[in-house]
Amino acid sequence: MREYLFPLRKITNKFQSINSKKDLQNFVKERAAHVTQTTLYGYLKTRIGTRYAIMIEDEKFAESINIAKWNIYVSAISDLTFYVFSYLIDKKNLKQNDAEEIFLNIINEEYKNGLSKNIHENAKNEFISKAKNINWHEYYQTNPFKESGLALY
């Protein structure tokens, strides 16, 4: 009963340090989901206004929102993964770069949750291609969230 009324552990877990690869993966996944939800749904509420609830119930519109949601989400996961590993490599001297593994784990999980095969494959191929050419020591300083920002358009 106490945990229900005062979910302290649930709240404080959000502020604990990242101590494992799994913690890092959860951080990237949760932050990317948060960014996607606040930007996409905030934008829609602003543009649609009072008709927001009605539009969400429209089947075609809901399908379009779902496609946009997945595109923005995988882009946010990609940008955040690159940012995190770039920062850790440059500032914290991280030696083992598991960016690709973390990214693929997340999108493979999301594929099971409804991410379309097309978006999954495109995101995977783009990430792998970009990872080959990235300057890991500078990426976090050079407009690291450009792609996910552009995914809104």
Name each region found by the language model.
Residues 1-60, 67:
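Leu/Val/Ala/Ile-rich N-terminal alpha-helices, chiefly Sec-type signal peptides and the beginnings
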Residues 29, 33-37, 69, 73-77, ...:
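Short runs of predominantly hydrophobic/aromatic residues within well-ordered alpha helices
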Residues 109-153:
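Helix-driven interaction modules
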